[in-house]
Amino acid sequence: DICAYISGLEQYFIKTGQIDRVRVAADEPGDFERYRKSLDIVRKTAPAFRYKTAFDHAEFLDHCEEGITDYAPNFYCACSQYEQLKKMQKERPDSRLQWYICCGPGYPNTFLKSDLLEARFLGIMNALLGFDGLLRWTYTCWTDHPLEDIRYGNWRAGDLCLVYPAKNGGILKSLRWKALKRGIEDYELLERIRELGREDVIEQIFHLLLREENVSNYILEDWEVLSDIFVNDYAVFEQARQIMLNNLEGMLE
C-alpha cells in the first residue's frame, strides 16, 4: 500500500531527525488538477513532509499551492516571469525560491560543449536574480560506461552528470564541476558584500561581467536565449574576483 509506505518514510525521517531536510518533489507538473490531488493525498498521509516543485510552465504560478516550501522555475520562467516571482518571494518569506537548468537552455549551461565560463556564470546569475539557489537535476546520472561515453538519447552530452565514477568507489570531478564551484564562490563573496551593505560594489561587478543586466531581456522569441549575456573572458572574471576580495578585506579591517 503506497500510503502505508509514505507514512513509514515520514516516521523514519522524524525518528532520525532528518524530517526538516526532506522534500517531496514534483518535477514539472503539467496536469494541475492531478498534481493537486496527489499533493492532497500525501499531505493527509504524511503531514510532516515539506514540498518542492520544479516547473517549466509559467501557468504554474497561477496554481501555486499553499504549503509548498521550495519553488524552482526553470531558466526561461525565472527570466520571463521575474517580477511575478520576486513578488511571490517577498510574500512568502518562509519559502525558498530557486531556479534550474536542465536540457535547456543551450546557453548558459554545463554541457560538454559549453564554455567553462558558462558554469561559472551561474553563480553570478543567481546573485543577479536574488534567488535562494540553483537547482541542477543531474550529478551522477551515469550511462553504462560513463568514462567512455556519456551520450544518452537526445540529451546533450554532459547533461546527465557533473562528476564521473572513480575506480576506488569515489568520484572524479569534472572541469565543469570545478567551474561551477568557482561560480558558487563568486556568489558567496557577493552575498557577503551584500550583507555588509555595499550594493555599489555589487553593481560594479555586474557592470563588469554582464552585457545585459535586465534578466527579462534574456528570453527572445520562440524561447531563444540572448547569446551574449555575459563577458566571456576568464581574465575579466578573475578581475571581478579580485575586486570582491579587495573590497571585503577593506570592509573587514
Ranges and model annotations:
Residues D1-L147:
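Catalytic-core regions of glycoside hydrolase
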Residues D1-A58, F131, L147-E253:
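Catalytic domains of carbohydrate-active enzymes that cleave complex glycans
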